[in-house]
Amino acid sequence: ASETFTDYCAPLAWQHAGFTSYPLAVSAAQGTLYASMLRESAKRQNPSVYVVEVNGFLYTEAERDELGTAATREWLDTLPLSRNKVQAIDECVQGDRLSYYVPLLKYHDNWRKPDLIRNSLSLQQQARDAGYSYTKPFLSISMFLTETDEIPVRQQSLDDFNEQSLRTFCETAKARGIKNVLFARFPHRTVIENYDAVFAELEAVVHEYGYDFANFDTQMDAIGLDPLNDFANAEHLNIFGAEKFTPYLADYLAQHYDLNTAHSQAVTDEWTRCAAFTQQMLPVCEDNTRRYTCEKLDEFSPVFADCH
């Protein structure tokens, strides 16, 4: 879910608590994608705990219809051809699947958009040159809520489709022998009808599989979040909110799980560079947010070119 981009900054957690973390997210990803994301992650790492933001298991049928195709494309088109990609296409795509194997069928006319291609190639080259993401990756939305902003009321629920997606994810984790998964509701201002019942049901399913649930919506006072100034919108924290929530979540994880904070010199050097880059990035994000520029800033934004 996109909250993983905006609400949590891995280099800040490293500075605060000394552990490494590697967020993986696709904006508006629904729960059907999560099992393949877990399988892909498990190819590359064996973390002490997986943290799963639960919004993807709560989309309504209308929201899934509206957002599902774009999010599915964004995830599946990044995967190299592999057993996981084939399985993910089978799990997530209804109807014609050929273009998911042959992207040229979908994107053959992109030559008409040279600026789009140029920007994409530039971002890919920057990532290759560094060898890793400096912010793992973090996104700042330069906005804040005001008293006149309308807070949406959503009819989200753990309907049959969402429950099956959640169970499939849990079964995938169990089959891989993954012991620690924290399902988390990151802070939101959105109002969900039947809120208590929705999250009680979700928590009950998670506990069936022996996994954990934490609702940070209900801990905003403890986190110190301002309901207006720390939110970019009803769904996402801004930079000020992220700077509060990240250490809070880091402390929660350190208290509840056995996290490794002893690292090789190579890992320490990498994360020290990431933290230094992030510290240069934060004041710019803060200033843009105070000025309500509405910009979305990440490590590849031109304003940070000299920081690399």
Where are these regions (language model features)?
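Alpha-helical scaffolding within the catalytic cores
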Residues: 36-39, 163-169, 196-200
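C-terminal regions of proteins
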Residues: 193-305
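Active-site segments of SGNH/GDSL-like serine hydrolases
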Residues: 170-195
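Acidic-and-aromatic substrate-binding clefts and catalytic sites of carbohydrate-active enzymes
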Residues: 28-32, 157-162, 189-196
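Membrane-embedded segments
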Residues: 2-87
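Secreted/periplasmic serine-hydrolase-like ester/acetyl group-modifying domain
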Residues: 68-178, 263-308
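Loop/turn elements at helix/coil->beta-strand transitions in domains of secreted/extracellular proteins
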Residues: 18-20, 45-49, 174-182, 209-212
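Active-site-proximal beta-strand/loop segments in catalytic clefts of secreted hydrolases
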Residues: 2, 24-27, 53-55, 184-188, ...
